[in-house]
Amino acid sequence: MAQSTLYSRVLGTGSYLPPDRVTNQQLTDRLAKEGIETSDEWIVARTGIHARHFAAPDVTTSDLALEASRRAIEAAGIDPQSIDLIIVATSTPDFVFPSTACLLQNKLGIKNGGAAFDVQAVCSGFAYAMATADSFIRSGQHRTALVIGAETFSRILDFKDRTTCVLFGDGAGAVILSASEEPGVLGSALHADGSYSHILCTPGNVNRGVIEGSAFLYMDGQAVFKLAVNVLEKVAIEALAKANLAPEQIDWLIPHQANIRIMTSTCRKLGLPQERMVVTVDQHGNTSAASIPLAFDTAVRDGRIQRGQHVLIEGVGGGFTWGASVFRY
């Protein structure tokens, strides 16, 4: 008897934003006290961002991940003890080690000895994490995965650099992936090119208890924009080809919420109407690895994304990394 094909399928989604919502005007006022000039109009025109959320000083990345995970677990209707794989995509972990995923496993009270680890691919981290979880499930090694993107990017922002500090926010998003004979994740593609590591980075490192180099995010905005618009279309087409789907068969595009200009450019190149693109960057800012699952959960909970629809996620981030996945929700 032929063995049936095993897929990974999304059972539930969840997200969490810290309560401190900071509008452009509030941020502008804060920067003005430091002699840094910007404006709501300047930020909106260049990024599409109107507000972002910042975590309180005593709140960690694993705390945000915990809230998003609880909501995803509730939506999936599963026992947390059935989760045998946890992958957290983050560039702002609680510690150098142990991993945020291990900390999260403990906070969730999961005691089954399942695997838990972090993925660090910056803004494309969730695409990397989801593809990794899908591979583990398809191989039969794990059955139920909790995949999270969570960030506290406010901790690595230089609030004297108006070109970067206005862009980012904190938050977390999560999905439950489970083994299924029903098609779920249909195709993924992941890439990296380390020769571009210098255009988007946080170059500092810890050496004998001292931070050497800068602990703040650095970005060459023009170089990032040029590379992003080039690779995102290509990786999306690659993932679609693996899924045996044409762009017009995609019901929803969920891009990494970095910049509205990059997002609309990719949507246009794929020939998709703007109405099929989920946009949350205006209210969340760029939450790095959290942006895709945050946007996904938002669109699921407001009723836009329905069961049976095809969803394309794609992202690009420091490294340089980029990736995409296509799945049927």
From Swiss-Prot:
The lineage of its organism: Bacteria, Pseudomonadati, Pseudomonadota, Betaproteobacteria, Burkholderiales. This is Beta-ketoacyl-[acyl-carrier-protein] synthase III. It catalyses: malonyl-[ACP] + acetyl-CoA + H(+) = 3-oxobutanoyl-[ACP] + CO2 + CoA. One of its GO terms (biological process) is fatty acid biosynthetic process. It comes from Burkholderia lata (strain ATCC 17760 / DSM 23089 / LMG 22485 / NCIMB 9086 / R18194 / 383). NCBIfam families: fabH, PRK09352.1. Homodimer. InterPro entries: ACP_syn_III_C (IPR013747), ACP_syn_III_N (IPR013751), FabH (IPR004655), Thiolase-like (IPR016039). Keywords: Acyltransferase, Cytoplasm, Fatty acid biosynthesis, Fatty acid metabolism, Lipid biosynthesis, Lipid metabolism, Multifunctional enzyme, Transferase. The gene is fabH.
